[in-house]
UniProtKB/Swiss-Prot annotation:
UniProt entry tagged with the keyword Secreted: yes
Family, per entry: Belongs to the venom Kunitz-type family. Sea anemone type 2 potassium channel toxin subfamily.
Record protein name field: PI-actitoxin-Aeq3c
InterPro entries found in the cross-reference section: Kunitz_BPTI, Kunitz_BPTI_sf, Prtase_inh_Kunz-CS, TFPI/VKTCI-like
Tissues where the protein occurs: Expressed by acrorhagi.
Length: 57
């Protein structure tokens, strides 16, 4: 398991309608994967780059 507990949270797009490419850690595949973030109400499993995601998770 990742050391950062936020990495275990589910991917969360959020209620806003922006379309920002972001990354989250998929605990099932054990990889950082891209998703489209809505721009607000994120959880701790939300990273601007794949590199940030890999460092954290």
């Amino acid at each position: 398991y990742p050391a950062n507990e936020g990495c275990l949270l589910p991917m969360k797009v959020g209620p806003c309608r922006a379309a920002w490419p972001s990354y989250y850690y998929n605990s099932k595949s054990e990889k950082c994967e891209e998703f489209t973030y809505g721009g607000c109400d994120a959880n701790a499993n939300n990273f601007q780059t794949e590199e940030e995601c890999k460092k954290a998770c």
